[in-house]
A protein has these predicted regions:
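Non-heme di-metal
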Residues: 1-280
C-alpha cells in the first residue's frame, strides 16, 4: 500500500497559499491583458480535476489504495485552480472565472481501462510540468512567475506518484500493465504526428457530449491552448523533446530496457499485440 507513505511525503512538501506566495511583490506594470487571460484559462483547466477525480474513483473501486491517493491529488489540483483564481481576484478581478465557467468543465467521462488512464495522467503530469515551467519564463509579473513555479513542482511530484502506482501495477498485473503503459506511451509521445497538444484535457472522453467532450472545448475560448503553446509561451520542439525524453527515460526504467526513441517504444508495444494477431 503506497498511500500512507505518499501522503507523508507530499505533506512535507506542500506549499501554503498564504505564506509561500509573495503577494506583496505584485507589479501591475508587468502584467499584460494577454498574460492575465491565459491565467484565467489555466485556472478553469485546473478546475477539471473535479470530473477527473470522479472518473478515477468510479473506475478504481477495486483499488482503495489508489483511490485514497486521489484525495491528495484532488486537493492539490483544486488548489492550483484556487491560487490562480485568487491571483486574478486580487489583481485582475474582471478576468476571474465565474462559477458557471468553472462548472462547464464538469461532465461525466466515459468509463475507461484504469491502467490506460493511469498512464495517460502520468504523461499528462510530465507534460504539464514543462508547460508550467515555460509559462513561468514567459510571464513577466513576479508573483505569477512564482506561482507557476509552484504548480510545476506539484505536477512533477504527482507524476512521480503515478509512476509508483505504475510500478505496483506491473508487480501485480505483469504484461497486462506493460501492454497498457506501452500503448498509451506511444500515443502520448507522438505529438508531432497528432498535430495537437497531447494532454488529458485535450482528448475526447465522452461519446454523449461529442464534440464538446474535451475539457478545452468547454472553455470560454476553446482554441486558446494551441495559441498559448505555439504563439505565447512558445512551447517549441526543444521543449516537446524534454517531455518525450522524460517519458521514455521513465518507461525505460519501468520496463527494464532502453528506449532511445518512440520507434523503440512502439516495437516494444507490438510484442504484446502479436499473440492476439496470431490467434485471429
Amino acid at each position: 500500500m503506497l498511500y500512507p507513505e505518499v501522503f507523508g511525503t507530499l505533506e512535507k512538501l506542500r506549499w501554503n497559499m498564504a505564506k509561500d506566495v509573495p503577494w506583496d511583490r505584485f507589479d501591475l506594470a508587468l502584467l499584460t491583458d494577454e498574460q492575465a487571460t491565459t491565467i484565467k484559462m489555466n485556472a478553469i483547466t485546473e478546475w477539471s480535476a473535479l470530473p477527473a477525480t470522479e472518473m478515477f474513483l468510479r473506475d478504481n473501486r477495486h483499488d482503495s489504495d489508489f483511490s485514497a491517493f486521489m484525495s491528495v491529488w484532488f486537493y492539490e489540483e483544486q488548489k492550483h485552480a484556487l491560487v490562480l483564481m485568487e491571483y486574478l481576484r486580487r489583481f485582475r478581478p474582471d478576468l476571474a472565472p465565474t462559477e458557471e465557467e468553472l462548472h462547464q468543465v464538469r461532465f461525466e467521462f466515459d468509463p475507461a481501462p484504469p491502467l490506460d488512464t493511469l498512464m495517460l495522467h502520468f504523461c499528462g503530469e510530465m507534460r504539464l510540468t514543462q508547460w508550467y515551467r515555460r509559462a513561468a519564463q514567459w510571464q513577466t509579473e513576479p508573483v505569477i512567475k512564482h506561482i507557476y513555479g509552484l504548480l510545476s513542482g506539484d505536477e512533477a511530484r504527482h507524476g512521480g506518484v503515478y509512476f509508483r502506482y505504475m510500478q505496483q501495477a506491473i508487480e501485480r498485473q505483469g504484461d497486462e500493465a506493460r501492454a497498457a503503459f506501452a500503448k498509451v506511451g506511444v500515443l502520448m509521445t507522438s505529438s508531432a504526428r497528432s498535430n495537437k497538444p497531447l494532454h488529458p484535457t485535450n482528448l475526447h472522453v465522452s461519446a454523449e457530449f461529442f464534440p464538446r467532450d474535451t475539457i478545452q472545448s468547454r472553455l470560454p475560448d476553446p482554441d486558446w491552448l494551441e495559441h498559448w503553446l505555439d504563439k505565447q509561451i512558445q512551447f517549441d520542439s526543444s521543449w516537446e523533446a524534454k517531455v518525450v525524453n522524460t517519458i521514455l527515460i521513465k518507461l525505460s526504467n519501468l520496463f527494464g530496457q532502453p528506449f532511445e526513441g518512440i520507434k523503440d517504444l512502439n516495437r516494444y508495444r507490438k510484442q504484446f499485440t502479436q499473440p492476439a494477431a496470431t490467434a485471429s
